[in-house]
Design a protein with these regions (language model features):
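Short, conserved, GDST-rich strand-edge loop motifs in beta-rich repeat architectures
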Residues: 100-111, 161-175, 273, 414-431
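Beta-propeller blade signature
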Residues: 110-119, 174-188, 234-240, 425-444
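Conserved beta-strand positions in repeat-built beta-propeller and related beta-rich domains
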Residues: 99-105, 158-162, 221-227, 288, ...
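Blade-level signature of beta-propeller repeat domains, shared across WD40, Kelch, NHL, RCC1
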Residues: 401-447
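Asp-box/WD-like beta-propeller blade repeats and closely related beta-sheet repeat scaffolds
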Residues: 135-142, 162-219, 224-225, 230
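Loop/turn-rich, solvent-exposed surfaces of beta-rich toroidal or solenoidal domains
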Residues: 284-310, 318-404
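Beta-rich, blade/repeat-based domains predominating
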Residues: 80-93, 137-156, 198-221, 252-292, ...
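Surface-exposed loop and turn segments in beta-propeller and other repeat-based domains
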Residues: 12-20, 24, 28-43, 49-78, ...
């Protein structure tokens, strides 16, 4: 099969069949030409043994066409279009969708909304709570809500970083502003838990929350801190006491010099034209099988630890760190996590336009792994975790937060990697509207 290179073209000659491409001039398809009939093409392969690959025949190679990045998994259904980029999502028992519009880079009119139609929203639980007034106690209003979640007894919780949009990067939160608040589904405030002031040091940045209503006397809340030093917090919902664990350890901190990838482009963090590396720590969080799962956003790592261990005040920080389980890398940044009632954890793989999953219970194994067989009992050891792809679709533009209800997995998207802080010279390459979706998984929320 002769190969010739001339005048910047590469020509691969198969008999009288030739495919030409000029490097750097665009899509390969636009530079392909076919000189003879398919019969001539076939004649060039007259000596190919039966059963081997032939051009454009059955079993032809992957990557034959530019559009060969296929769709994996079930179809996704749009449920709401947003004019701003949301980070948080919840769904109540009536299938109402709630979204949060954070104030990380600027003010937003409403921090938390309920969707009233495919395109419309209104402030939730009220317009008055959305913005703190001059001199108001920041524990009584929204400063910078990051997420909203539904717990197992029908309460909606918001997690507020307490860091105003005008604060310098790395600033500590306002005391009283960093908090979680519980509401019933009519929007009535039930209780506010303020994060103690001594735990706000080093820029503690509350990002996401999950609630276990059955742990302890009145339940516990688990919160990821996505600051550079990072940590995982736990709040006793009985008395409000709070612990901050794993502070500034490798299991919550970003990879040094981390560079992500999105749609084929490398992603740095930019200050105008000054290049930096993203340092976002523990971000997404889920509770499943008695464990707390979290991912480190500026990495491809995720971890888990027993909920009981994390809240045990008798254990030292060193003992808690030693109990952390490392299942290995998962091939993507992970912006959000959620879990279902079968012990499956869903990982929102932002770099891959995908949602992954991993089973944590042996009873849910789909195939033998090492010495484990499907239908077993107990937890799957970390070394035997196999992360799989649930869905991959070009419409999944950085899935961020998700929730499961009545068999549906809901999630929002926000194109984070295309936002000004991750684009050269603070260019905003996002294109709205920002759509939230759902897909069928046939399972209920984690309890």
């Amino acid at each position: 099969m002769p190969i010739r290179i001339d005048q910047g073209y590469k020509a691969f000659k198969l008999g009288d069949y030739c495919v030409n491409s000029r490097p750097g001039t665009g899509s390969l398809v636009s530079h392909m030409w076919y000189s003879l009939s398919s019969a001539s093409i076939a004649s060039a392969y007259w000596d190919t043994p039966t059963g081997e690959y032939r051009p454009f025949g059955p079993g032809y190679n992957r990557g034959a066409y530019p559009q060969d990045y296929g769709v994996t998994g079930p179809p996704i259904q749009g449920v709401h279009d947003s004019q701003q980029a949301p980070t948080g999502l919840a769904v109540d028992h009536e299938h109402n969708v709630y979204l949060t519009y954070p104030r990380n880079t600027g003010q937003t009119p409403s921090n938390v909304v309920i969707c009233t139609s495919f395109n419309d929203e209104k402030p939730w639980p009220s317009a008055e709570i959305q913005n703190c007034t001059q001199g108001q106690d920041p524990s009584q209003c929204f400063v910078n809500v990051q997420n909203v979640v539904l717990d197992s007894i029908g309460q909606l919780w918001v997690v507020d970083s307490g860091i105003p949009y005008y604060a310098a990067s790395g600033s500590d939160a306002l005391y009283g502003g960093a908090k979680i608040m519980s509401f019933n589904q009519t929007g009535e405030l039930i209780r506010t838990y303020v994060i103690p002031q001594d735990l706000l040091a080093h820029g503690m940045n509350a990002n996401d929350v999950r609630i276990n209503n059955t742990l302890g006397t009145n339940g516990w809340a688990f919160i990821t801190d996505e600051s550079t030093n990072s940590s995982v917090l736990a709040i006793n919902l009985d008395d409000g006491s709070t612990v901050r664990r794993l502070f500034n350890t490798s299991v919550v901190r970003a990879d040094p010099g981390y560079v992500g990838s999105y749609e084929g482009e490398l992603i740095y963090c930019w200050n105008k034209t000054e290049k930096a590396y993203c340092t976002t720590g523990a971000d997404g969080i889920a509770l499943a099988s008695g464990q707390v799962f979290w991912g480190v956003l500026a990495s491809r790592r995720f971890y888990y630890i027993s909920q009981d261990v994390l809240i045990d005040s008798s254990l030292t920080d060193e003992q808690v760190l030693a109990a952390v389980q490392d299942p290995g890398q998962c091939g993507s940044e992970q912006a959000g996590f959620t879990a279902d009632d079968h012990g499956r954890v869903y990982i929102f793989a932002s770099e891959q336009n995908a949602i992954y999953y991993v089973d944590t219970l042996q009873s849910e194994l789909e195939m033998p792994v090492d010495d484990l067989k499907p239908g077993g009992t107990g937890l799957i050891p970390a070394k035997d975790y196999v992360v799989k792809t649930l869905v991959r679709n070009a419409m999944i533009q950085h899935a961020d937060s998700g929730a499961i209800l009545d068999g549906w997995l809901y999630f929002c998207t926000n194109q984070l990697e295309l936002s000004p802080g991750r684009q050269y010279n603070h260019t905003d390459n996002r294109r709205g509207p920002f759509r939230s979706y759902r897909l069928w998984v046939g399972r209920g929320p984690a309890v």
